[in-house]
Amino acid sequence: MKHLKLGKIQWIALLVVSAMFVNLCSHMVLAAARDGNDPAQGTTAEATTASEATTEATTASEATTETTTEQQEETQSMGEYKAFWFSFYDYDSYRAKYKKRTAANFRTYFTGVVKKGKSLGMNRVIVQVRPFGDAIYKSKYFPWSKYISGKQGRNPGFDPLKIMVEVAHDNDMKIEAWVNPYRVTTGSTNYKKLAKNNQARKWHAKKSTRRNVLSYGGSLYYNPSKKAVRTLITNGVKEIVQNYDVDGIHMDDYFYPSFTKRNVKKAFDAKEYKKSSYKKKKKSIYTYRRAQVNTLVKQMKKAVKSVDPNVSYGISPAGNIDNLTSKYSYYVDVYKWLNSTEYVDYICPQVYWGFKHPTAKFNKVTDRWIKAAKSKKVKLYIGIAVYRAGHNVGQNRAERKEWKRDTKVLKKQVQYARKKHVDGFAFFDYQDLKSKTSAKAVNQLKTVLK
């Protein structure tokens, strides 16, 4: 019995060793197949299995890469600036909806605005509070806006900005107050249509201060060359930061109006230029005008930060850099702003064109802004035209087709700019985010913002 038991053990051991040897050989074949060396100089079942395993591994790797990319985009999206503009047109919609305007129904209306933005993945709302030298809040310096009360100078009976700040923060959304610096009117030069307490009207009434407000192209503007104007604009921004818990101050693209080759050296603030040190030092009127805007922008940032360093200050200029830096319009020294910490915290160019635009393709314009912001001293956001989605608009047939039919156009713009590592986006405008015309494009946009 003892001898028989020993034989069984030996037999079992022999089987185990044999199995280990076969397994070792199989692994050698598999390893050789993976290395591209076929010891049998032919295709074996093990080599085929190894090839299939390698293919599966590659597929898994690709899937992992795709998942990682999606996760990276999602992570990037979570930290992005994702804003939408709420303009004076949107106050018109509020007034049209409610014949009797009250604090309660304004709160209800704006709560709907914020919830719509949140549902799309937005985390910030930019509310217009000074569209035309007026105020959609209680101001010491500017009259009540007609866009909230129906008539300039008329008190609506509640403080819209106070309500908007409360509603935004209650819904975990940040809010910026948006001002237009120089614009007083559009399409009218009749001072009598302005409220009696409008500073533009009061300045115009006195000969000594009349040039603080200029008439040009059928509209009225505050004169960028006047120190009193810069002080007024700065005080208006400072009071917002002092009195309201806003997260940012936002300015848009209304700086100098556009001139022609014929009138550029004669019109608007040319008189102030001729009396300036710039003229005496033989510096051009173009340099002079850029300096006036630069002085205001720097002064405004300093004022904002003096009240609350945590409040951001940014500007959304027109999207075409050539227009901004031309001799005939805007006089926005955008390269200086982008590469210095003295002027703004962010720039958000309005890149309102499609990929098919003949001369200002979205990708090309975006790339140019990225290159201009190479120092990374200022955050770069991209403004996107939701208002064009679903509409037959554009400079050529291809672009019109793109905006009208490509429901992924907004999504593609975000994806393109995101791959280029811009810091965020702003979408114009609230009304278009909820319109039927742009609904399909907005639904696609939502997939890359949520």
Where in the sequence are the language-model features?
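Aromatic-lined carbohydrate-binding/catalytic grooves of carbohydrate-active enzymes
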Residues: L120-P156
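Polysaccharide-binding and catalytic clefts of secreted carbohydrate-active enzymes
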Residues: A200-N320, T325-S340, Y352-W353
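Substrate-binding cleft of secreted/luminal carbohydrate-active enzymes
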Residues: Y335, N339-A360, W369-A372, K376-K450
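The substrate-binding groove and active-site-proximal loops of carbohydrate-active enzymes
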Residues: Y89-A104, Y141-F158, S215-T231, K281-V293, ...
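Active-site-adjacent "subsite" loops/lids of carbohydrate-active enzymes
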Residues: Q76-R107, E176-A177, Y182-N243, R400
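Catalytic domains of carbohydrate-active enzymes, especially glycoside hydrolases
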Residues: T108-A135, N243-G248, S340-I347, K420-G424
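Sec-dependent signal peptide cleavage junction
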Residues: V22-P39
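Aromatic- and glycine-enriched glycan-recognition loops and surfaces
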Residues: K100-L120, K146-N171, N235, A291-K298
